[in-house]
């Protein structure tokens, strides 16, 4: 296996990480650092904060967010499939059918488990 072909990729990664670290270090060293309580408090539309900004969220918010991301990715995979359906033919159609069936089974599972109920 010829590893010399990967040298430009390695060089790109090293330069990118090095440049990023250098810029963050320069900003940290040269930037002003004068914190006070008003700057460190959360901004809430010009009003005094109603509650602590560091309060814990209900786990259901995270669950709904994760489920949204999963089904959003499913939709993102459906668009190219719909565009290329004529070129991929029946094998692509059946492959997408299996893909959709897996997500349908997952959706029914989370529905039956009550993950979508908000009580």
Curated annotation (Swiss-Prot):
InterPro entries the UniProt entry points to: NAD(P)H_OxRDtase_bac/plastid (IPR023043), NADH_UbQ/plastoQ_OxRdtase_su3 (IPR000440), NDAH_ubi_oxred_su3_sf (IPR038430)
Subcellular location(s) per record: Cell inner membrane
Coiled-coil segments: none
Main subcellular location: membrane
The protein's assembly and partners: NDH-1 is composed of 14 different subunits. Subunits NuoA, H, J, K, L, M, N constitute the membrane sector of the complex.
Purpose of the protein: NDH-1 shuttles electrons from NADH, via FMN and iron-sulfur (Fe-S) centers, to quinones in the respiratory chain. The immediate electron acceptor for the enzyme in this species is believed to be ubiquinone. Couples the redox reaction to proton translocation (for every two electrons transferred, four hydrogen ions are translocated across the cytoplasmic membrane), and thus conserves the redox energy in a proton gradient.
Membrane-traversing stretches: 7-27, 63-83, 88-108
Organism: Ralstonia pickettii (strain 12J)
Listed GO CC annotations: NADH dehydrogenase complex; plasma membrane
Protein name according to UniProt: NADH-quinone oxidoreductase subunit A
Domain of life, per lineage: Bacteria
